[in-house]
Amino acid sequence: MEKKKVVLAYSGGLDTSVAIKWLQEKNYDVIALCLDLGEGKDLGFVKEKALSVGAIKSYMVDVQEEFANEYALMAMQAHTLYEGKYPLVSALSRPLIAKKLVEIAEQEGATAVAHGCTGKGNDQVRFEVSIQALNPYLEVIAPVREWKWSREEEIAYAKENDVPIPIHLDSPFSIDQNLWGRSNECGILEDPWAAPPEEAYEMTLALEDTPNKPEFVEIGFEAGVPTTLNGTAYSLAELIKTLNALAGKHGVGRIDHVENRLVGIKSREVYECPAAMTLITAHKELEDLTHVKEVAHFKPVIEQKITELIYNGLWFSPLKQALHAFLQETQKNVTGTVRVKLFKGHAIVEGRKSEYSLYDEKLATYTAQDEFNHDAAVGFISLFGLPTKVYSQVNQKKVEA
C-alpha cells in the first residue's frame, strides 16, 4: 500500500518528535517543517533531529521578516491587546505557520498536514481554521489530540521507538516564543494566586535588577511602520529584536494575565513583550498627534474587532481582510518620531513630532500668541447645546402644567 505524505509543523520537542513515529505507524511519510520566527533556537539542529527521528524530508524556513511585516506590523498598528493586556504573541504566528504548511503540502503533493496541539487550547482552532481557509481539501491531523496519552505514556512510547527525549523535559513550563514576545504557562503558573518565579522570565529583567537610570529611545515611523531607532535604520524584524533587548533590560513588557480562551476555559499565562508594548505605546501616541478626532475615536472599535478575530483564529476571514483595509488607510499620515523613556518596567512617551501633526500650538496656547477665536465659542455653544435646551424646555412645561 502506497504511503501518503503529511507535512508536520515540527518544533523539535517531545510531542512533535513522537508525532513523527506515530504518523509513520498510520502509513504516512512525514515531511517536517520548522519556521524561524525569531525565537532564538538552533533550528539547524531541529531540522536534523526531524530527519534522525524518521522524517523523509525536513524544511527550515526563515520567516522573521515576513512575520514582522505581514503579521506583527498589523498587530502594532491595530494596538491589539486581547482583553486589554495580551499582545497576541502566539496567536499571530499560527496563521503564518498554517500558510507555510499549506504551501509545502501543495509543493510536495501531500494529502495532509499535522500539528502538535492538544485538544484544550486555542492553537488547534487557529491552525485548523487557517488551513481550511487556505486549502479546504487538505486533511488536518492532530496526533496529540488523538492519542490522549499521559506524559508518562508518551515518554514510554518515545523510549520504545528511540525518539530522543529533550534534556529540559522536566521543566514545568510550556513556552512559546517569537519576535513579538514570549508566552509561558503550566507549572506553578496554573495557580493564579502564586507569584511567577523569576525563572519563568527570560526576555526581561526583574525591576530590582533593572538600571537605576532611565534610557531614552527615539522611534521613527513612516506611514505607520517603525523604521528607525535613535536615527539608525533597521529592517522591521531587526528593529523589533533590538528593541526587545533595550526595553527588556528595563523590565518593560511583563504581563501576568488570566485570560478567557476561545475553547471556554480560563488560563493563566505570563508574557514578556518588551518591543511589542513599547511600539504599541509609541505608535498610539503618534496617531493621537496625526489623526482627526473622528478617526481617533472610531479606530478603537475596529481595533477591538481585529484583536478578537486574530485571537480566535480568523486571520484569513473576509471580515479581517476588510478591516485590514481600513487600518491601512488610517496609517498614511502616521509619520514622525516618538521619544520614549524606558525605566523600571515602563515605556513612557515624553515627546512626539510629525510633519502631519494636527496640533497647532497657536490655537492651543493660553499665552499672548493665542490665535483661537474666542468669540466663536458663544455661537458654537448655543447650537451645540440647542437639543438639550429644547428638551429641558419641553419637559419643564409639562411639569408646570
From Swiss-Prot:
InterPro entries: Arginosuc_syn_C, Arginosuc_syn_N, Arginosuc_synth, Arginosuc_synth_CS, Arginosuc_synth_type_1_subfam, AS_cat/multimer_dom_body, Rossmann-like_a/b/a_fold. L-aspartate binds at T118, N122, D123. GO terms for biological process: argininosuccinate metabolic process; L-arginine biosynthetic process; urea cycle. It comes from the Bacteria. PROSITE patterns: ARGININOSUCCIN_SYN_1, ARGININOSUCCIN_SYN_2. L-citrulline binds at Y86, N122, R126, S174, S183, E259, Y271. Keywords: Amino-acid biosynthesis, Arginine biosynthesis, ATP-binding, Cytoplasm, Ligase, Nucleotide-binding. One of its GO terms (molecular function) is ATP binding. GO terms for cellular component: cytoplasm. The keyword ATP-binding applies. CDD domains: ASS (cd01999). It is an enzyme of class 6 (ligase). It holds the Pfam family Arginosuc_syn_C. Its EC number is 6.3.4.5. Homotetramer. PANTHER family: ARGININOSUCCINATE SYNTHASE (PTHR11587:SF2). NCBIfam families: argG, PRK00509.1. Belongs to the argininosuccinate synthase family. Type 1 subfamily. This is Argininosuccinate synthase. It comes from Bacillus cereus (strain G9842). The lineage of its organism: Bacteria, Bacillati, Bacillota, Bacilli, Bacillales.
